[in-house]
Regions:
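N-terminal membrane topogenic signal
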Residues: 1-14
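Short juxtamembrane and helix-loop transition motifs at transmembrane-helix boundaries
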Residues: 1-3, 18-44, 62-74, 86-100, ...
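Transmembrane alpha-helical segments of multi-pass membrane transport proteins and ion-pumping complexes
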Residues: 15-28, 80, 84-96, 110-122, ...
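Pore- and pathway-forming membrane helices of multi-pass small-molecule/ion transporters and channels
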Residues: 16, 20, 31-68, 111-117, ...
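Short, tandemly repeated low-complexity microdomains enriched for cysteine and small residues
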Residues: 72-77, 153-154, 191-192
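Cytoplasmic-side transmembrane-helix entry/capping segments in multi-pass membrane proteins
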Residues: 73-82, 103-108, 127-136
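Individual transmembrane alpha-helices with interfacial aromatic-anchor signatures
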Residues: 176-201
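Short, highly charged, low-complexity non-transmembrane loops/tails of multi-pass membrane proteins
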Residues: 211-231
């Protein structure tokens, strides 16, 4: 077990470094660098386009689950698009069938899209079903966190400004009093972007780990004693 853990150390260091950098960049991007006004508590109001830390970790994990190589990166990148698109159908269609407070439209579309993603696995080995579910879940989760826009009328907020945040009619239903209220189109774009970043992080982590892996020492071959017979 000790040898196995020792063998994982280069990858562990690489993942730790990249995880720190991604988390630091994503949170600063969302709450300090690209924003729409001062919230008065040391943080800023996130713009409609923002970065979501956990989404990248989902795709990063799927990269390793798919094999952790270039082929895995392709599989997960494709799966991200299919899964996110399937979730967007739910986001858009649920409110068309039945909006707040009826959940049956959400449940129905989730069932249909989940079944469809499984069936599409028959297209070939390139269609990695687990990653499609990871992408689907990421979009769906962020939709809930950001106010269930379209299903909940005005749930994604209106105007995305500090002034709009101060009015219950325009603040939206997102977490933290509407701070992360987001329209469904941006929910889709933001999560898909972060899922793609997760694939890149996976590829970078394997390459960085290779740099940290000690090179095997060359084996020294001793010269035969002088006068010995050579077979």
């Amino acid at each position: 077990m000790a040898e196995r853990m020792k063998g994982l150390l280069p990858l562990a260091v690489a993942v730790g470094i990249l995880a720190f950098l991604w988390t630091w960049v994503a949170l600063n991007f969302t709450f300090h660098w690209v924003t729409n006004g001062d919230l008065g508590n040391g943080l800023d109001l996130p713009a409609n386009f923002h970065l979501i830390v956990p989404a990248a970790f989902v795709a990063w994990a799927m990269f390793f689950a798919a094999g952790g190589d270039n082929e895995a990166a392709k599989k997960v990148a494709i799966a991200n698009v299919f899964g996110a698109a399937a979730a967007f159908v739910v986001l858009w269609g649920a409110g068309e069938l039945a909006d707040l407070p009826d959940f049956w439209s959400i449940a129905l579309l989730v069932a249909v899209m989940a079944a469809l993603l499984v069936v599409l696995g028959g297209l070939g080995d390139w269609f990695f079903i687990p990653a499609t579910f990871g992408a689907f879940a990421s979009v769906f989760f962020w939709w809930i966190a950001t106010g269930l826009d379209k299903w909940a009328p005005g749930g994604g907020g209106v105007g995305n400004s500090v002034k709009a945040l101060g009015d219950p009619a325009t603040a939206g239903a997102g977490a933290f009093g509407g701070v992360i209220s987001t329209p469904i189109g941006w929910v889709f774009v933001n999560i898909l972007a972060c899922l793609t970043i997760g694939v890149v992080l996976g590829m970078l982590s394997t390459r960085l780990a290779a740099l940290f892996t000690p090179k095997p020492k060359p084996v020294k071959h001793e010269a035969p004693p002088a006068g010995s017979a050579v077979a």
